[in-house]
Amino acid sequence: MLRLDKFKKYPLTFGATPIEHLPRLTAALGGKVQIYAKRDDCNSGLAMGGNKLRKLEYIVPDAIESNADTLVSIGGVQSNHTRMVAATAAKIGMKCVVVQESWVPHEDAVYDRVGNILMTRLMGADSRIVPDGFDIGIRKSWEDAIQSVKDAGGKPYGIPAGASVHKFGGLGYVGFAEEVRAQEAEMGIKFDYIIVCVVTGSTQAGMIVGFAADGRADRVIGIDASGTPEQTRTQVRQIVDNTAELVELGRKVRDDEIVILEDYAYPAYGVPSAETNEAIRLAARTEAMITDPVYEGKSMQGMIDLVKKGYFPEGSKVLYAHLGGAPAINGYSYTYRNG
């Protein structure tokens, strides 16, 4: 049994998220593989929720115990993560500084004024747009923001991009795996594959550790959306090892149990391809399930392509992890102006 119980958890979500069968999407893809979705996009009342809240539930107790008064984080201009950090800060009564780097080579008249960044500002966060480009690692702009809070007499608590390389960043998605196992028992089924978008890495890494407990680590199929897959793979490996030790998995996860597919991130991080847009429209028009062009649209594209290519054996049950992110689609208003 994985030892998640050792760690304090601050409630930011409604609890277990629903799993739903997607019959019209299943039929549209030929009906030979059954598609389900785990709706982590519907996990909270905090500013439209999303996957980062699972991670932050295990990080907030540490932030509170540190006597911090300001959460400091980083992401792109349309970062879901910085929205969730801003929401968490508002909920627990802390100040918030978020650095918004220029990660996406995307031009839209309203890109920096709608969606995630709009809500981030609305919740009172100090949102600082900087020109630095995309990188999932530890960033100088973030370190500078932490120092600026100190210089102003504040007590910062740093949360890296995606909450991923934080010491507790992988715990929330170990919990996801435990939750899925309980739901499988209730539903009387077992999922053969789990599809998840991967960029900064801790969502997939936590799932890998969680599903390693029942031998399904290599059934967690990461769809890279970073466009820098080797950096992502290295970061996932590090988070897997750290998280496995924290929860006492009792063995090292093998390299061949970390599955990341690199075929769908093109043309660049945050820039949807024609195939991404087709996937977004198909999910919307068959199941009214909204996915975004940065993350979930690309993992949806990957899943659709894998089904069509016969990657999954006939009769497989595939669980699509919907991590949230729909607010970002507002920053692509011209792309989707006609649907």
Curated annotation (Swiss-Prot):
**Biological process GO annotation list?**
1-aminocyclopropane-1-carboxylate metabolic process; amine catabolic process
Q: What GO molecular function annotation could you give as one example from this UniProt entry?
A: pyridoxal phosphate binding
Q: Which InterPro entries match?
A: ACCD_DCysDesulf (IPR027278), ACP_carboxylate_deaminase (IPR005965), ACP_carboxylate_deaminase_bac (IPR020601), TrpB-like_PALP (IPR001926), TrpB-like_PALP_sf (IPR036052)
Protein origin, superkingdom: Bacteria
How it assembles, according to the record, is: Homotrimer.
Q: What is this protein's function per UniProt?
A: Catalyzes a cyclopropane ring-opening reaction, the irreversible conversion of 1-aminocyclopropane-1-carboxylate (ACC) to ammonia and alpha-ketobutyrate. Allows growth on ACC as a nitrogen source.
Write down what this protein is called.
1-aminocyclopropane-1-carboxylate deaminase
State the organism of origin.
Bradyrhizobium sp. (strain BTAi1 / ATCC BAA-1182)
Gene name, Swiss-Prot/TrEMBL: acdS
